[in-house]
């Protein structure tokens, strides 16, 4: 283990973090930056324990049809399980030299509870309060989850949770000294078969709104930009949305991997059609091309070496689709532009909910009952969704469902 004090705490010790943020930090370390990550598992201590047993060393293999490349990662120097280790985590965050909390906890983690230790935002509020009590130096809290405006969402929930501590000075400190830059991350990382070897694609991207953390992460491929929004929307609407579509098709057709689904010309065309319509809903960042980006996404998904399972991508649709599809349809309706392929995507989701015996979703019971009844209006009017879908879309979704 390197003799470097932990200065980054990562909430969400999954395969994605280990094949993405930890790789960027490793490359920064290789370039001479004094960085070290403590990574936190919040659901199951098994991953934390396995990484510790491996001496906090593992291999990331970048692979495509033409070649593969291995990289040893040692940027994670400690692992913990929350809530068991919350006191140790508080000590880490309270250290004067601590820099940032980063997060990959999936969309469903962004909830509020009046039990401070029950949710991700509450836990972050608690850790920040422990820092506030020891030092008033600010830090960054960087959400890397697939939420548009993830920094603002995180800040709002952390501030709401902070009110539970009845410390007005702390709330003001969070507002003025804790930074919540928006960020966008991208890399296809399937669930690993071996915790010591993560297989991923050569492509990797991390875009962060301008922040002092740039001092440590510049020069290793992290992009610091004035506005992340365009990059977020490209990823959510041109990549994540079609990834979901392919996953539901795969589950319905009994096709194990999304690369096999997109290998079918009719599904490849469907993906292209979704991307074409979605691209009309927003403006891409300067220097980017929606058509080139979309084509690159199709090629990346088709990578046959990744083994990315339809079942893995299909889970938690109620948490993903509002951000990936609902907002897009709403904006296309406002612009009086066609959205039939996106309506078809949602119809396929409803069909999957009605027919699959492998639905894994926090709203599964409600969704399945409504999907089996083909109650499109009832399903998409549920108050549980983070984004309300414009009811003007219901008729189109029903028509697409009838045509499946």
Where do the protein language model's features map onto the residues?
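Substrate/ligand-engaging "lid" and interaction regions
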Residues: 1-404
């Amino acid at each position: 283990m390197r003799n470097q004090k932990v200065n980054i705490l990562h909430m969400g010790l999954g395969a994605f973090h280990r094949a993405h943020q930890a790789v960027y930090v490793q490359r920064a370390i290789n370039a001479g930056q004094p960085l070290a990550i403590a990574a936190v598992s919040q659901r199951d201590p098994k991953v934390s324990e396995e990484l510790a047993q491996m001496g906090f060393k593992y291999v990331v293999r970048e692979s495509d049809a033409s070649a593969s490349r291995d990289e040893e990662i040692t940027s994670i120097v400690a692992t913990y399980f929350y809530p068991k280790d919350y006191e140790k985590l508080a000590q880490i965050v309270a250290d004067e030299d601590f820099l940032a909390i980063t997060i990959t906890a999936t969309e469903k983690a962004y909830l509020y509870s009046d039990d401070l230790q029950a949710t991700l935002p509450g836990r972050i509020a608690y850790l920040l309060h422990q820092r506030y009590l020891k030092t008033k130096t600010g830090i960054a809290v960087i959400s890397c989850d697939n939420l548009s405006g993830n920094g603002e969402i995180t800040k709002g929930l952390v501030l709401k949770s902070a009110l539970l501590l009845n410390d007005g000075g702390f709330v003001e400190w969070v507002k003025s000294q804790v930074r919540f830059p928006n960020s966008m991350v991208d890399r296809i990382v399937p669930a690993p078969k071996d915790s010591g070897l993560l297989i991923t694609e050569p492509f990797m991207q991390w875009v962060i709104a301008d922040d002092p953390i740039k001092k440590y992460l510049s020069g290793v491929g992290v992009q610091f930009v004035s506005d992340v929004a365009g990059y977020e929307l490209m990823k959510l609407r041109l990549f994540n949305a079609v990834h979901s579509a392919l996953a539901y098709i795969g589950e319905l057709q009994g096709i194990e991997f999304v690369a096999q689904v997109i290998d079918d010309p009719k599904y490849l065309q469907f993906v292209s059609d979704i991307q074409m319509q979605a691209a009309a809903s927003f403006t891409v960042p300067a220097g980017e091309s929606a058509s080139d980006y979309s084509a690159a996404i199709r090629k990346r998904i088709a990578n046959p070496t990744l083994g990315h399972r339809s079942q893995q991508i299909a889970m938690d649709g109620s948490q993903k689709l509002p951000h990936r599809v609902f907002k897009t349809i709403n904006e296309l309706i406002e612009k009086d532009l066609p959205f039939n392929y996106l309506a078809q995507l949602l119809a396929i989701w409803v069909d999957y909910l009605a027919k699959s015996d492998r639905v894994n979703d926090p709203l599964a019971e409600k969704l399945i009952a409504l999907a089996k009844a083909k109650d499109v209006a009832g399903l998409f009017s549920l108050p549980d969704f983070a984004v309300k879908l414009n009811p003007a879309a219901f008729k189109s979704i029903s028509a697409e469902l009838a045509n499946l």
